Swiss-Prot record:
It comes from Hyphomonas neptunium (strain ATCC 15444). GO terms for biological process: queuosine biosynthetic process. InterPro entries: QueC (IPR018317), Rossmann-like_a/b/a_fold (IPR014729). The keyword Ligase applies. SUPFAM superfamilies: Adenine nucleotide alpha hydrolases-like. Its cofactor is Zn(2+). It comes from the Bacteria. Disulfide bonds: none annotated. Its EC number is 6.3.4.20. Catalyzes the ATP-dependent conversion of 7-carboxy-7-deazaguanine (CDG) to 7-cyano-7-deazaguanine (preQ(0)). It catalyses: 7-carboxy-7-deazaguanine + NH4(+) + ATP = 7-cyano-7-deazaguanine + ADP + phosphate + H2O + H(+). This is 7-cyano-7-deazaguanine synthase. The keyword Nucleotide-binding applies.
Amino acid sequence: MTQPISSALVLFSGGQDSATCLAWALDRFDRVETIGFDYGQRHAIELACRPKVRAAIRQMSPVWAEKLGEDHMIDAGVLKSLGATAMTHEVEISMTAAGLPNTFVPGRNLLFFTLAGALAVRRGIGVLVGGMCETDYSGYPDCRADTLKAQEQTLRLGLDADIRIDAPLMYLDKAATWQLAQELGGDALVALIGEETHTCYLGERGARHDWGYGCGTCPACELRSNGWQRWQDGKAAAP
């Protein structure tokens, strides 16, 4: 089955990376839809950010507003029932015996892409876009390029469809991700990401920093804030 490559389905959580990927997709495809997943995460703040980001992006550009289509919310609560992680249960963030942070939810991205692929086939969409990245901190195995290549092949075979997975942030660090947002949508998109997206593992929205809201000390906040500072330092040093 041939799927059109002029359309994309963005895995959109409401965080910095997926918001940047949404802008990236709107810059490249004729029709863009979004898909989000409620998997029983400890803090639903990201999910609450999703409609705000979509609405703000519509206001930023009439061209993007015309391209941005339907949003789909999927119940993936089965992930929480499989076992405790720091993303789904009230446990402290730590390293596991396997050498991975316990913020890793086993199988999460594999399930997300499977569900997104099934929806894309029904919607006549040929490209799935995800904000996975193997450059920064986590080392999550389901964020690696090899994993996504294998997942793409599995979807193509299992769905008999010419589906492609694009991961525009795969080899970018957080500083480069901020720069990409600037290139795609200028100061307006950078400001939108800072104000409306959410990354903090602890769900903190009370403290506003230059880079956005968060506790400032969890691994996700440190990654985002350090990336912001490196980006700012790079701009200041530029001739």
